[in-house]
Amino acid sequence: MAVALRARNAVKVEDGIDTSNIIEEVDDNTKGTRSRASRRRRRRGDEEEKHSEEETYNEFNDDGTLKTEGTLQTGNGSGRPFELVAGLPCSLDVPQYNSALTFPLSVRDSGVLYSSLLSSRRTWISGEMFEVYWTRANKVPSLAIKDESIIKELESSKEQDASGKDRMQRMCDCELMAGPHTFSIKLFIVKDDEKEKKWQEEQEYKKKEKEEQKKLESEQRKKRAEEKKQMLQLKKQEREKQMQLQKEARARAKKEQAEARQRQKEEERQRKLMNKERVKEQKASTSKPKKDQNKKNSDQHMIANLNIMAQRDPELKKLMAKVANGQANMQEIEEFKRVIELAKNLPPPGTPPAKPEVQKAQSKPTDSNETSADSSKSEILQESKTNESDKKATAEQATEPKTHSEENKPESENQSRDNSEKSASSHNQEASIKKEADANSVIKKESSDGDGNKSQQPKRKYNKAPKVADELTEKEKEMQLTAFQQKYVTGAELVLEFAENTNFRFLLPKKAIIQYIPESNRYKMSWLQIHNQSDITRFYKRQVKELTRRIHNAEEKQRVTDEYNVFRDKKCPSPLFSSMTVTFSGIHVKFNSIMMNSFDPKEEVRGYMEDVLAVGTRLSGYNLWYQLDGYDDRELAERLRSELNEYEQSLKPKRQKKQ
């Protein structure tokens, strides 16, 4: 039957025959045969008797060709240049229509081409080139069967049908292109118990690993919380310790401040007593009249003004130096006298302007410490200016009487001593006030950091994470495999079902080479169809049993079985094979990994094919006779046309048949 299949697929056109409108010609031919339908039915009995007498014995020769025994009967009872293989005229040689046919019929009237296409399609749908995996149970009414054994057998077959069907899950719908035919098929994935078990173990392992990870994270969170708690406790203790130190520093600062104020009061009291005593001594020691004192003061002011004027005018400074050294002439002396008169008329240096004095007189001091500090500063400034003017006017003071300087000396010493005491007391007071202010600021800062830490800390703002769409895009959804399909990304066992024959499902061969064509999204599958596979399988089992008979170790048995190559055994029957190629189209891209990884590795398949090609025999094809003789082959042509007509009528709906 496989040889006939190859012959039907080997469609050849000889002698310039046009087959472009073959189907239309066959349809016209079948219309012409309707008028002879009644005559055909009358002769059907005779034809069946003739066909029953025909016997054909097909066997394979050593070279793979078909061997026929007996006599082939034809329609006219005489020898013909072709043989009937599966009811179709075939020959090994190329048909010679001009020499073999006396009255050749057209391709349309012969009906061989369309019949061969129909027979080839039926052969593909019956799955003769595939291994049957599942068969639908017979749907026979149980009431019509009285034999209990048959009923039990049907029930068991139904149970097997249900269990086998449950082991297959539909993958996709697609198209299968084989030769000139295109079939609508469904692909299924066969459930594998080992893969399911392995998948379950992996899921349990992942679940266990996830639980351990979750437990570890929980322990780490607890540990971090404990460390944080301890850190907060340490911070709290440190803060309390700091607060205690601050309290002690504050108390110490207050104590020092009180001592400084007490010391300042004591110094103020002592200073007042000393001033009173000094005034008494000054009054007692003063013997000169007040006029001399005023003169002395005016001379001092004049000298101070001269010094200031000399600092501003370099020429005046040179003039003063000449007069002091006795080098000035009369004109320069007269000029110096005018300068002296001018210096006498000027106000004393350091005299504040009138407006600040009025404001100072009108302002009321609020703090005794501030007034004393300001007065001490003004006195120190006045004394420093006076001392400077005294140093610069040493030349003029040399002409003054000595008694006048000696009398003024105690007063200046007492005044400078008083000013130094005032400045020292003011400096001490300012230092104590500054120290107290620093201590208060530190205490306030620490207390705010310690007690009011929670209130002053800014609230933490949590930025909400952008919402991630839970639903995937349409494209990602389409590319998503189901949980079951993800288990069989590699090593899946695929089953196909023809839409024209849903009672059978066939396994795709594992020892095949699959090729993906991305431009057209198609898969091309090629394999070797061994027609005597059953004989080779029986021989393989006998040899493996013989090789492993004395081996008791299971692993060793498995190793020997895997290493044994039946095609390299010289006693192995010679494989009779045909090369097959089909194309799958319409399969979604997401199933690419399943399709490409569901077959044996290419290197292994290539080695298997090389072994078969080395020792096997490729079956030769037949050539169909698309034209028959109008007289010698009229009965054969009539039978083919009538069968085509019946097939065409079966395809029409019932409503059209009635018309």
UniProtKB/Swiss-Prot annotation:
Map out region (Disordered) in residue numbers. 28-68, 203-309, 341-470
Q: Where is the composition biased (Polar residues)?
A: 360-375, 422-431
Query: What GO cellular component is one of the record's annotations?
Result: Swr1 complex
A single Pfam family it belongs to is Swc3
Q: Where is the composition biased (Pro residues)?
A: 346-355
Q: What is this protein called?
A: SWR1-complex protein 3
Alphabetically, which GO biological process terms does the record hold?
A: endoplasmic reticulum organization
Q: Extract one GO molecular function annotation from the record.
A: ATP-dependent H2AZ histone chaperone activity
Q: Which residues form the signal peptide?
A: none
> Coiled-coil regions in this chain?
191-286
Which residues lie in Basic and acidic residues bias regions? 44-54, 203-299, 376-421, 432-452
Report the sequence similarity comment from the record: Belongs to the SWC3 family.
Q: How does it assemble?
A: Component of the SWR1 chromatin remodeling complex.
Q: What is the stated purpose of this protein?
A: Component of the SWR1 complex which mediates the ATP-dependent exchange of histone H2A for the H2A variant HZT1 leading to transcriptional regulation of selected genes by chromatin remodeling. Involved in chromosome stability.
**Compositionally biased intervals (Basic residues):** 33-43
Compartments it resides in: Nucleus
Keywords, A to Z?
A: Activator, Chromatin regulator, Coiled coil, Nucleus, Transcription, Transcription regulation
